[in-house]
Amino acid sequence: MQIFIKTLTGKTITLEVEGSDNIENVKAKIQDKEGIPPDQQRLIFAGKQLEDGRTLSDYNIQKESTLHLVLRLRGGGGKKKKKKTYATPKVLKRKLRKVKLAVLKYYKFDENGKIKRVLRECPAETCGAGVFMAQHANRQYCGKCHSTLVKKSK
């Protein structure tokens, strides 16, 4: 029977084969006509690659069927990218610790049972409520408006 082989260049080759012929025999005939070694040939029929150990009848290839010839690509992914090495270790992100009832550290109870605020709010109008002043040994400092209140020494 006669089958057609279509190459990537668009050229069509005609081959005389039998249904019992192996795929290796077909590749050998293509090598005789085109000079392409069988190990570089890939034959495709009905979207499937034809394996060397099978026959044409295994793939239901009949007379005047068209096989597509593509070349096998050798090689792989090329040069691998080298992993970067750093001289200093990577700085880990700080993990926030959730403290239960953390607000209580801003307030104290005096001997009468009254609540007293430990931190002082900034008196400046630009800061507003909720901006506390930092406690130093001899002064109080606002980090937002940079105002400083000096403590009176006894």
UniProtKB/Swiss-Prot annotation:
Keywords: Cytoplasm, Isopeptide bond, Metal-binding, Nucleus, Ribonucleoprotein, Ribosomal protein, Ubl conjugation, Zinc, Zinc-finger. There is a cross-link at K48 (Glycyl lysine isopeptide (Lys-Gly) (interchain with G-Cter in ubiquitin)). A zinc finger (C4-type) spans 122-145. SUPFAM superfamilies: Ubiquitin-like, Zn-binding ribosomal proteins. PROSITE patterns: UBIQUITIN_1 (PS00299), UBIQUITIN_2 (PS50053). One of its GO terms (molecular function) is zinc ion binding. Residues 1-75 form the Ubiquitin-like domain. One of its GO terms (biological process) is translation. It holds the Pfam family ubiquitin. One of its GO terms (cellular component) is ribosome. There is a cross-link at G76 (Glycyl lysine isopeptide (Gly-Lys) (interchain with K-? in acceptor proteins)). CDD domains: Ubl_ubiquitin (cd01803). The keyword Transcription regulation does not apply. Ubiquitin is synthesized as a polyubiquitin precursor with exact head to tail repeats. Some ubiquitin genes contain a single copy of ubiquitin fused to a ribosomal protein. In D.discoideum there are 9 genes: ubqA: 5 copies of Ub and a final Asn; ubqB: 1 copy of Ub and ribosomal protein eL40; ubqC: 1 copy of Ub and ribosomal protein eS31; ubqD: 3 copies of Ub and a final Leu; ubqF: 7 copies of Ub and a final Asn; ubqG: 5 copies of Ub and a final Leu; ubqH: 5 copies of Ub and a final Asn; ubqI: 4 copies of Ub and a final Asn; ubqJ: 4 copies of Ub and a final Asn. In the N-terminal section; belongs to the ubiquitin family. This is Ubiquitin-ribosomal protein eS31 fusion protein. It comes from Dictyostelium discoideum.
